[in-house]
A protein has these predicted regions:
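Juxtamembrane intracellular "pre-TM" segments in multi-pass secondary transporters
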Residues: 24-43, 221-252
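Helix-loop boundary and gating motifs at the non-cytosolic
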Residues: 35-89, 247-277, 283, 287
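Residue-level signature of mid-helix packing/kink "hotspots" within the transmembrane helices
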Residues: 89-97, 182-183, 295-303, 388-389
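Helix-to-loop junctions at the C-terminal end of transmembrane segments
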Residues: 95-108, 193, 300-313, 399
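Structural signature of the two symmetry-related core transmembrane helices
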Residues: 111-125, 206, 316-331
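Cytoplasmic helix-loop-helix junction between adjacent transmembrane helices
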Residues: 139-180, 363
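Helix-loop junctions on the cytosolic side of multi-pass membrane transporters
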Residues: 160, 217-230, 424-429
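Symmetry-related core transmembrane helices of the 12-TM Major Facilitator Superfamily/SLC fold
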Residues: 200-217, 406-424
Length: 429
């Protein structure tokens, strides 16, 4: 007896039920994966770190602005001030290397950030109670060492919080808030000195400093919980950081920092050029006004530079900033005797530092392996500190022995070297 179920021809069209199944299968195979929703980059954690940077900068800019006046009242010379600041910078650089090694552990980096902000605030404010120069040196050195410890931890925390595709904007926001603090700190110092005097003003700087520590605690509470891992001994990893694209990036950063002179030399150059035909006080005020313009330019450009870095690549923004620095050094070398003649050099250097500081952090975060971020930021921060110290020292010698123009020409050469070294740096995919 024949089978009652009809059998379709072998090469005939499939039945409707089979068509549906095949179509569904084809669609399932060809459909692209559903894209993940982008995380908002300006999250509570990013805002918390930005607030910490702003408040901390306000807090330590007050004693920094008033330190020359305090030391003068203690009978200290300008050479002693320079020595204290040089030692403090060296301690900060060493502490940044150590802080980077400790910050590879997510648990340690959180404790370092809170402790670093708190210690900097307390030690800086205690300078207002000193009775001798050596006490200033100890407290300033301790405050800067604590500041050095916290920097790699803060930068690594920000990389934990921000989505990778928005590193540029996140670090740009942090730099903008830091620069706002650099503007607000001296203005607050001027106001407080008129109300309570130099020593009390320095003592009151503890308030914004401790508020910065609270802001970091807030940011940590909004940081994704780190995966548990075995407690590792503290060690600074160097070899992997100096290899490949990360190594090339560090060489480029080192070259830049060897030409990244302290902004006080910009102010000195402007003061000397503006002084002929003017009272010294007027020249100083005009030079400080140009310095404020420098900080405003850096603040305004930081977030847009980060946004461009997210779209076009942080190394492109870094290269642009380095090139602008080279152009500003040419302006400082040529000089001028009016504010209008000097303003372009200050504005160019302000835009340049806004681009460079934003893109340096974002580049390190994007190029460094996740497990080495703390060490990478530590090496980076150490290079910054020691490079700045070397740049200012050599430029100062050339300034005194030959001429200011020679010093700025020397610095411009380092910008060219940094641009060449930056070639070939690639972000991690």
């Amino acid at each position: 007896m024949a089978d009652p179920t009809p059998t379709p021809p072998a090469d005939g069209p499939p039945q409707p039920s089979e068509q549906v199944d095949l179509t569904h299968s084809a669609v399932a195979e060809e459909s692209p994966p559903v894209p993940k929703l982008q995380q908002p980059w300006l999250s509570a954690g990013v805002v918390g770190i930005g607030a910490a940077s702003f408040l901390a900068d306000v807090g330590h800019e007050v004693p920094t602005a008033l330190l020359p006046s305090l030391l003068n009242s203690l009978g200290a010379s300008a050479a002693i001030l320079g020595a204290i600041e040089g030692v403090a910078d060296a301690l900060a650089g060493t502490a940044r290397l150590a802080g980077g090694a400790m910050s590879d552990d997510p648990a340690r980096r959180r404790a370092l950030a809170v402790g670093g902000y708190s210690s900097t605030a307390v030690l800086s404010s205690l300078i207002g109670a000193v009775t001798s120069v050596w006490q200033v040196a100890v407290l300033r050195g301790g405050a800067w060492a604590a500041r050095g410890l916290r920097v790699p931890a803060r930068n690594a925390l920000l990389a934990d919080i921000a989505p990778p595709e928005a590193y540029g904007r996140a670090y740009g926001f942090e730099r903008a808030m830091d620069n706002l603090g650099a503007i607000g700190g001296p203005l607050l110092a001027i106001m407080l000195v008129g109300l309570v005097g130099v020593r009390s003003a320095i003592g009151l700087s503890v308030i914004p400093g401790l508020l910065a520590a609270l802001a970091i605690v807030y940011a940590i509470r909004h940081t994704p919980k780190a995966e548990k891992r075995e407690r590792q001994r503290i060690r600074l990893v160097i070899r992997p950081i100096l290899a490949g694209s990360l190594g090339r990036l560090m060489v480029a950063i080192a070259a830049f920092e060897f030409g990244n002179v302290a902004v006080t030399l910009f102010i000195l150059r402007a003061t000397q050029l503006l002084e002929p035909g003017r009272p010294h006080t007027s020249a100083v005020q005009l030079a400080l006004g140009l310095y404020v313009a420098y900080n405003v330019a850096a603040t305004v450009v930081s977030v847009p530079a980060g946004r461009i870095g997210d779209r076009k690549g942080s190394t492109l923004v870094l290269a642009s900033g380095i090139a602008l620095f080279g152009a500003s050094y040419v302006g400082f070398a040529i000089g001028g005797t009016t504010v209008l003649a000097l303003a372009p050099a200050f504005l160019l250097s302000g835009v340049a530092i806004g681009c460079v500081e934003t893109s340096q952090n974002a580049a390190v975060a994007s190029v460094a392996p996740t497990e080495l971020r703390g060490s990478a930021f530590g090496v980076f921060a150490g290079i910054q500190s020691f490079g700045n110290l070397a740049a200012s020292a050599v430029a100062g010698i050339l300034w005194t022995a030959i001429s200011p123009a020679t010093a700025f020409a020397y610095l411009a050469v380092w910008m060219v070297i940094a641009l060449v070294a930056l070639r070939g740096v690639r972000s991690r995919s």
